[in-house]
């Protein structure tokens, strides 16, 4: 028995020696069994096949891992560069725009000019085929017009606020955007927030309230305009989310481009109605008599328009590369960068309580972003 076990390592399979001695069979049957794939030692072909499978799965895996690692590094560097450009364009836009509004207090005209710069840049983009032209149906156009109205009012009200109060204060108030995002998502989409999201809104509201009470440049027009811009901008974002669900939805860049063009068309007659026709040599002369030459005024106005469209375009490009939650965190950091740079450039006086209020509001925005990340994180499931 021991000898049989030694000769046959697998006791379940009959030993070849045992078969040879105990089973009488003809030479023809032995020959046919030798050439039969089903009867001849079934473990050997499987071992060879498994070894082949192991090699073919191992070698490309190492090569592919290196490609993925280098690809992720390139993508990370590209994304980091785009975030840097986004922040830099925001800083320059707020600096140029504030200097223009200081000497030329016509926010509707300024906003229309800036949207006109964006419209020209979009036309160049489509003519040079840098991005495919959009195709949309009449039913989609109706929804896009609604988005354009919200976009127009958001930009106009932001410029009204920037013309009345400090840049840092306007952006502190605009840190309230998550509050209105949650509110409008409940009203328009029926999406109820989690407890963590509601808790993260408390420091935002408290911080903005403290910063408002201690703001040296506070006035009600500037405050209410910034707050109203939060409502219109977040209405646009929530409606965009609803619009982008369909299979025939436009991509982010084309959607933003069409919204910009329609906003420009809507705002030109509105600017004439609100401000009057203020693009005359006499009005420009009055504006330049307050510290800027005609050349400086024109260059700053043009650069503000280019920076506005460029940073919004880059923002949409980043949104296509990352999740909305990551984009929200980046937007929070952007506010910190813009507020800090504007305080340093314009030498804005800031009290300790004002600083605490601003920091509290921005910390709340960051907590909101983290709470959103927890909410959207899927539960792992075994497949």
Swiss-Prot record:
Residues 1-55 form a transit peptide. Phosphoenolpyruvate/phosphate translocator that transports phosphoenolpyruvate (PEP), 2-phosphoglycerate and 3-phosphoglycerate. The lineage of its organism: Eukaryota, Viridiplantae, Streptophyta, Embryophyta, Tracheophyta. Pfam families: TPT (PF03151). The keyword Lipid metabolism does not apply. Residues 93-212 form the EamA domain. InterPro entries: Sugar_P_trans_dom (IPR004853), Tpt_PEP_transl (IPR004696), TPT_transporter (IPR050186). The chain crosses the membrane at residues 76-96, 108-128, 143-163, 179-199, 210-232, 253-273, 299-319, 350-369. It comes from Arabidopsis thaliana. Keywords: Chloroplast, Membrane, Plastid, Pyruvate, Sugar transport, Transit peptide, Transmembrane, Transmembrane helix, Transport. Belongs to the TPT transporter family. PPT (TC 2.A.7.9) subfamily. Disulfide bonds: none annotated. This is Phosphoenolpyruvate/phosphate translocator 2, chloroplastic.
């Amino acid at each position: 028995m021991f000898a049989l076990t030694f000769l046959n390592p697998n006791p379940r399979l009959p030993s070849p020696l045992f078969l040879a001695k105990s089973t009488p069979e003809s030479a023809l049957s032995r020959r046919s069994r030798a050439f039969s794939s089903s009867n001849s030692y079934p473990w050997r072909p499987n071992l060879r096949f498994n070894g082949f499978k192991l090699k073919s799965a191992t070698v490309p895996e190492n090569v592919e891992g290196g490609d993925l690692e280098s690809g992720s590094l390139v993508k990370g560097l590209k994304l980091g560069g785009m975030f840097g450009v986004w922040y830099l364009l925001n800083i320059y836009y707020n600096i140029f725009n504030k200097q223009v509004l200081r000497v030329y207090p016509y926010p509707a005209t300024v906003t229309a000019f800036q949207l006109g710069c964006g419209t020209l840049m979009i036309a160049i983009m489509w003519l040079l085929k840098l991005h495919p032209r959009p195709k949309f149906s009449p039913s989609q156009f109706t929804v896009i017009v609604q988005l354009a109205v919200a976009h127009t009012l958001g930009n106009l009200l932001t410029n009204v606020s920037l013309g009345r109060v400090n840049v840092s204060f306007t952006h502190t108030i605009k840190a309230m955007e998550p509050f209105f995002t949650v509110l409008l998502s409940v009203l328009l989409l029926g999406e109820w927030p989690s407890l963590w999201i509601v808790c993260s809104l408390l420091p935002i509201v408290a911080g903005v309230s403290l910063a408002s009470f201690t703001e040296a440049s506070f006035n009600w027009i500037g405050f209410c305009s910034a707050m109203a811009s939060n409502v219109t901008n977040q209405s646009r974002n929530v409606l965009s989310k609803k619009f982008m669900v369909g299979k025939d939805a436009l991509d982010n860049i084309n959607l933003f481009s069409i919204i910009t063009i329609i906003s420009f068309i809507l705002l030109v007659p509105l600017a004439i109605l609100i401000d009057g026709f203020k693009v005359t040599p006499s009005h420009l002369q009055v504006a330049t008599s307050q510290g800027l030459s005609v050349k400086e005024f024109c260059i700053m106005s043009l650069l503000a328009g280019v920076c506005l469209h460029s940073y919004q375009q880059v923002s949409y490009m980043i949104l296509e590369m990352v999740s909305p939650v990551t984009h929200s965190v980046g937007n929070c950091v952007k506010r910190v960068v813009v507020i800090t740079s504007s305080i340093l450039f314009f030498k804005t006086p800031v009290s300790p309580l004002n600083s605490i209020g601003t920091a509290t509001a921005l910390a709340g925005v960051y907590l909101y972003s983290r709470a959103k990340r927890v909410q959207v994180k899927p539960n792992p499931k075994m497949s």
